[in-house]
Amino acid sequence: MVSSSRIARSFTRYTSALQRHTIVTKIKQKFPCPRSRTQGQSRRSETHTISRRRSCRAIARSNLGRVSSVTLPWFSCPSPAVVALAKKPFRTARSSCPRSRKSSRCRKSLLSWTAHHLLDEFPKRRIWVFLSFRIGGSLHRRHAMEKNICSTRARIRLISAISLLSKPIVEIVVGYPQSEDRRL
């Protein structure tokens, strides 16, 4: 297992290089709305759900900004480690949110969609999750977590924990070390 200090050093070098040159790729146009249509809904509520889903996707695209697909030296994944870089902190997503009066709920939902998108790129196993926070005008120290997502309940707990963070997140990296990948 790769030590946490080595991971922190590699992550610092990686983010420094990423700031100089970012490999920009198209983000998947799949941002599931938190509420899907269920049986028994009226036509009016169905129309509202469809309209809200379109708004959700537009908000996610505008606030996520660039999404880069990269492979870190010590990461090995079925698909490259996905990095979400926001043009602005998620806390400011309230400006274009249709539920602007409930800005904190909107921010948490947007962050949940992002976490779902990143976690879906990986098998259910132990992974590393890196979060970057912006406080004021400077980038705060990155926080690394090693999590076990071998069950659906564990994945939901991880996504909920990320969504409930009070600090505005500007970067999320999900992946796992090569040594873990070879144990498959």
From Swiss-Prot:
Location in or out of the cell:
Mitochondrion
Chain positions covered by the region annotation Disordered: 32-52
Name the domain of life this protein comes from: Eukaryota
Keyword Mitochondrion among record annotations = yes
The alphabetized UniProt keywords are: Mitochondrion
Where does this chain mainly localize? mitochondrion
Other known facts: A stretch of 270 kb of the mitochondrial genome is duplicated within the centromere of chromosome 2 resulting in the duplication of the gene. The expression of this duplicated gene (At2g07682) is demonstrated.
Under which name does UniProt file this protein? Uncharacterized mitochondrial protein AtMg00870
